[in-house]
Curated annotation (Swiss-Prot):
Lineage, top ranks: Eukaryota, Viridiplantae, Streptophyta, Embryophyta, Tracheophyta
SUPFAM superfamilies (alphabetical): FAD/NAD(P)-binding domain
Function noted in UniProt: Plays a crucial role in plant growth and development. Is essential for the biosynthesis of carotenoids. Carotenoids are involved in different physiological processes, including coloration, photoprotection, biosynthesis of abscisic acid (ABA) and chloroplast biogenesis. Catalyzes the conversion of zeta-carotene to lycopene via the intermediary of neurosporene. Shows stereoselectivity toward trans C15-C15'zeta-carotene double bond.
Gene3D superfamilies: FAD/NAD(P)-binding domain (3.50.50.60)
Name of the featured protein: Zeta-carotene desaturase, chloroplastic/chromoplastic
Length: 558
């Protein structure tokens, strides 16, 4: 979708320059993957799996998103046979991207890698993708109306927890009174306990799932202004909902890691598009080890039966591609779906089980991702003339938050992920995440572009006079699951009551939040359950094979 939007230019601005101080921070993934797990919650940082010595299993995975691919990598490493099926034309799921007819890379969302993404970094190192991450300055930057900038600046010679305490005490995003009350609330949180007892702190944090972060924060002395100016943008960026509607568990999980690990708050972004620099290397790793990925093959139905003792088991997957249909049979079946996907897939009869019925208590959050290409550099606040030239990229190279627009977080991908997004002779490519996305789902794309572009000029007055030369809009009706108070108990374990059927996905039970890290961790947990049950699963398949009636592999479309 192309568009042309122009706003009148204004005079020069007087904006305080950003500090250029730099302090050494350990940004090596080699050390991060090992160091992050030291004195940390065991649920977030599971040990390396022991070598599998049981029978080789044939595994069919539904879904080629990060959870499905994580599961596949772990199972292939243990010697199993893996096939992945996905109805899409590209891999990656919510972390996927594709190229349009004009050569533009379109993403499903804005993907930022927090320093505490230990399991995802481990996966990226395994597949050789760690070199595809670009480390950003160790600051969290807030863009306020009229171009004023607030920061949580973690750049300090002394690490956790001192660097974090200092960042909150000196931030210019909050007024002195709000900073004081903010510090008081955090001092009274399980975050402090995490410094000496990380597993105990995580248990305390889980127990706070039933209340919203706002209710918890205000009860500990925090202020509404702190929520509005700082924590709401962060909450929207993490889970696409605000602090009033987000469980305290989610925010405090992040805080506990930020407080105890110096690098946890350090941000990274991919060199370029996820399809090339994240999903691509994982796919290569899978296929190099004999795994197979079948795109455009969607699962229409889970086939199942019951044994004489009334136990349910899966007998196959009915899948289709255009007019072709077939039955896939395996020893093990894994549904690596998102919330709406798993609800569509599960047989209605399975809802008689509380385990499966609980999943229907979860719902996804709508989100809209907008890309805007400009003929200049929107985030260059110091020099308007420099912002108008197109010989070199200038501006803010980091994830940006804002409390003053409908998009809570955004970035200039031409700066932050230049390999695929910087185009010679063109300027900024803003990628903005509209949260909550509900008001925009029915809005025409051109109206969305116009509204977002107007809000950009309110944040960056220096961008007035620049033209939007190209744009795209991606709407996802149900993205991350809504991590509202009281929903955590409804998240299912990866191991289900059906012996040969497992789940994976960031919505499933794991100690991190719904995210890329959560998806990766869920895949590790699913693989671990499968390997633990290897002997039993192989025996079950022998029993099913001996008693099953012949079913043709290929079915014609009726």
């Amino acid at each position: 979708m192309a568009s042309s939007v122009v706003f009148a230019a204004t005079g020069s601005l007087s904006v305080p320059p950003l500090k250029s101080r730099r302090f050494y921070v350990n940004s090596s993934l080699d050390s991060d993957v090992s160091d992050m797990s030291v004195n940390a919650p065991k649920g977030l940082f599971p040990p390396e799996p022991v070598p599998y010595k049981g029978p080789k299993l044939k595994v069919a995975i539904i879904g080629a998103g990060l959870a499905g691919m994580s599961t596949a990598v772990e199972l292939l490493d243990q010697g199993h046979e893996v096939d992945i099926y996905d109805s899409r034309t590209f891999i990656g799921g919510k972390v996927g991207s594709f190229v349009d007819r004009r050569g533009n890379h379109i993403e499903m969302g804005l993907h930022v890698f927090f320093g505490c993404y230990n399991n995802l970094f481990r996966l990226m190192k395994k597949v050789g993708a760690e070199k595809n991450l670009l480390v950003k300055d160790h600051t969290h930057t807030f863009i306020n109306k009229d171009g004023t900038i607030g920061e949580l600046d973690f750049r300090f010679p002394v690490g956790a927890p001192i660097h974090g305490i200092r960042a909150f005490l000196v931030t210019n995003q909050l007024k002195p009174y709000d900073k004081l009350r903010n510090s008081l609330a955090l001092a009274l949180s399980p975050v402090v306990k995490a410094l000496v007892d990380p597993d105990g702190a995580m248990r305390d944090i889980r127990n706070l799932d039933s209340i919203s972060f706002s209710d918890w924060f205000l009860s500990k002395g925090g202020t509404r202004a702190s929520i509005q100016r700082m924590w709401d943008p962060v909450a929207y960026a993490l889970g696409f909902i605000d602090c009033d509607n987000m469980s305290a568990r989610c925010m405090l999980t992040i805080f506990s890691l930020f407080a105890t690990k110096t690098e946890a708050s350090l941000l990274r972004m991919l060199k370029g598009s996820p399809d090339v620099y994240l999903s691509g290397p994982i796919k290569q790793y899978i296929t190099d080890r004999g795994g197979r990925i079948h795109l455009r093959w969607g699962c229409r139905e889970i086939l199942y039966d019951k044994s004489a003792d009334g136990e349910t088991y899966v007998t196959g997957l009915a899948i289709s591609k255009a007019t072709n249909k077939k039955i896939v049979k395996a020893d093990v079946y894994v549904a690596a779906c998102d919330v709406p996907g798993i609800k569509r897939l599960l047989p209605k009869e399975w809802r008689e089980s509380r385990f499966f019925n609980d999943i229907y208590e979860l719902e996804g959050v709508p989100v809209v991702t907008v890309q805007l290409r400009y003929n200049g550099w929107v985030t260059e606040l110091q020099d308007i003339e420099l912002a108008r030239q197109l010989k070199r990229a200038v501006g803010l190279d980091n994830l940006l938050y804002t409390p003053d627009a409908d998009f809570s977080c955004f970035a200039d991908l031409a700066l932050a992920s230049p390999a695929d997004y910087y185009i010679e002779g063109q300027g900024t490519l803003l990628q903005c995440v509209l949260t909550p996305g509900d008001p925009y789902m029915r809005m025409p794309n051109d109206k969305i572009i116009e509204k977002v572009a107007m809000q950009v000029t309110e944040l960056f007055p220096s961008s007035r006079g620049l033209e939007v030369t190209w744009s795209s809009v991606v709407k996802i009706a149900q993205s991350l699951y809504r991590e509202a108070p009281g929903k955590d108990p409804f998240r299912p374990d990866q191991k289900t009551p059906i012996k040969n059927f497992f789940l994976a996905g960031s919505y499933t039970k794991q100690d991190y939040i719904d995210s890329m890290e959560g998806a990766t961790l869920s895949g590790r947990q699913a693989s671990s359950y499968i390997c633990d049950a290897g002997e039993e699963l192989a025996e079950l398949n022998k029993k099913l094979s001996s008693s099953a009636t012949a079913v043709p592999d290929e079915l014609s479309l009726v």
